[in-house]
UniProtKB/Swiss-Prot annotation:
Cofactor remark from the record: Binds 1 zinc ion per subunit.
Name of the molecule in the record: Small ribosomal subunit protein uS14
Subunit structure: Part of the 30S ribosomal subunit. Contacts proteins S3 and S10.
Cross-referenced InterPro entries: Ribosomal_uS14, Ribosomal_uS14_bact, Ribosomal_uS14_CS, Ribosomal_uS14_sf
Gene behind the chain: rpsZ
Any single biological process term in GO: translation
Domain of life: Bacteria
The keyword Electron transport belongs to this UniProt entry's keyword annotation: no
Record organism: Clostridium perfringens (strain 13 / Type A)
PANTHER family: 30S RIBOSOMAL PROTEIN S14, SMALL RIBOSOMAL SUBUNIT PROTEIN US14M
Residues involved in Zn(2+) binding: C24, C27, C40, C43
Length: 61
């Protein structure tokens, strides 16, 4: 779980736009965030298994 101080800092508008970075909306994780969904890979996987992300299927080839 991300530190609460870092999550609060992330929510504020940065002084310069280049300082902005992605962070998971659910858990606050700063790494491996899928921009299309706005959540990290771990949260994405959990939601996909539950069927809460429409149109998402497990790959099989």
């Amino acid at each position: 779980m991300a530190r609460k101080a870092m999550i609060e800092k992330w929510k504020k508008e940065p002084k310069y736009k280049t300082r902005a970075y992605t962070r998971c909306r659910l858990c606050g994780r700063p790494h491996s965030v899928l921009k299309k969904f706005g959540i990290c890979r771990i949260c994405f996987r959990e939601l996909a298994y539950k069927g809460e992300i429409p149109g998402c299927r497990k790959a099989s080839w």
